[in-house]
Amino acid sequence: MSAIVDIFAREILDSRGNPTVECDVLLESGVMGRAAVPSGASTGQKEALELRDGDKSRYSGKGVLKAVEHVNNQIAQALIGIDANEQSYIDQIMIELDGTENKGNLGANATLAVSMAVARAAAEDSGLPLYRYLGGAGPMSLPVPMMNVINGGEHANNSLNIQEFMIMPVGAKSFREALRCGAEIFHALKKLCDSKGFPTTVGDEGGFAPNLNSHKEALQLMVEAAEAAGYKAGEDVLFALDCASSEFYKDGKYHLEAEGRSYTNAEFAEYLEGLVNEFPIISIEDGMDENDWEGWKLLTEKLGKKVQLVGDDLFVTNPKILAEGIEKGVANALLVKVNQIGTLSETLKAVDLAKCNRYASVMSHRSGETEDSTIADLAVATNCMQIKTGSLSRSDRMAKYNQLLRIEEELAEAAYYPGKAAFYQLGK
């Protein structure tokens, strides 16, 4: 009764008003699974291909009708009749049907939409929530959120090069408390920005985008906002950065417009170390350019015992590239973005590889999101203990947080919130 009888995709819009792919998978039992695919702004060179139409007469060339057609024709023909519980087999069929390393024929937005919709349909058919279907029985951790409260880089029109300044409520006793902590700091930050004459418009991920003079000024604002909300930075909340360094790495140097300076990789590692010494920063994502392996090695040697160093553009959720990074001893955590690799099975393989090598995993959204909340279930199913899904505004971000609230409620005593234990790889 769990055989696939129909697969249908459509073009919908994401949180930036750009087209993306949504897919429905119908099973013989009458159950349907639906999933929608996110899209990134700052993307890694080795990410799986997001197939766009290129027709400038529609959505400035960003339409996804080709990807939709691939789902409704080649993929549907290959998968109809197969048991939806055979997730790995289904994903492998799509990988072979595409025939490229980067999903360049079918498009990762086509394969991922189907992969996630199949999992949702199979979970529904089994009478299980998605996190239980994928994660099995037993206790599960709710993730510590990385809440993006100040935006820079490609996510905002300001002078800050570092793309995301985030708070992590590690002192909370539950996810519900952590969410309240983040929301209260977010609103305190808004009042603080107002009082200083900064605009309170928000960036793609819901954080504020004030035109500050330096990265230190952004971090100091976060300290003040935490205190104004009744929390202590360094105890109740820790900070996290997403440098997205590939966006300002040119000609072998890191160019910081906000600072008016350029740095070699060794100098930029020292710059980041200076921020860590001055502020309670526990996590730095993409602290070096994705191709600057020497810089990553320097940064890992300098900070890898006390700070989580997350590879996003560096690893692009690709098990092969992650394995290379593990072998070279760079970074100590993996950012997990399902659309970087294009299937659920490959995503889970990357998370498993990270765990086996004591690399932490951070489940992540993209800057272009939808109301789809699959990553919330994935964060719990994989027990990855961290999630990055934006600020405390915009319903596309809140959809994930609200789903985590529901999951915590459903799990009750079987749920736990790890707090600082989420950074288990540090000090190893």
From Swiss-Prot:
UniProt GO BP: glycolytic process
GO molecular function, one term: phosphopyruvate hydratase activity
Top-level lineage group: Bacteria
Catalytic activity of the protein: (2R)-2-phosphoglycerate = phosphoenolpyruvate + H2O
An example Gene Ontology CC term for this record: cell surface
The EC number(s) this enzyme carries: 4.2.1.11
Pfam families: Enolase_C, Enolase_N
Cofactor names: Mg(2+)
SUPFAM superfamilies xref list: Enolase C-terminal domain-like, Enolase N-terminal domain-like
Compartments (UniProt record): Cytoplasm; Secreted; Cell surface
InterPro entries in the record: Enolase, Enolase-like_C_sf, Enolase-like_N, Enolase_C, Enolase_CS, Enolase_N
Enzyme class: lyase
Cofactor note: Binds a second Mg(2+) ion via substrate during catalysis.
Pathways per UniProt: Carbohydrate degradation; glycolysis; pyruvate from D-glyceraldehyde 3-phosphate: step 4/5
Keyword annotations from UniProtKB, A to Z: Cytoplasm, Glycolysis, Lyase, Magnesium, Metal-binding, Secreted
PANTHER family: ENOLASE
Protein name: Enolase
Lineage: Bacteria, Pseudomonadati, Pseudomonadota, Betaproteobacteria, Neisseriales
Gene field: eno
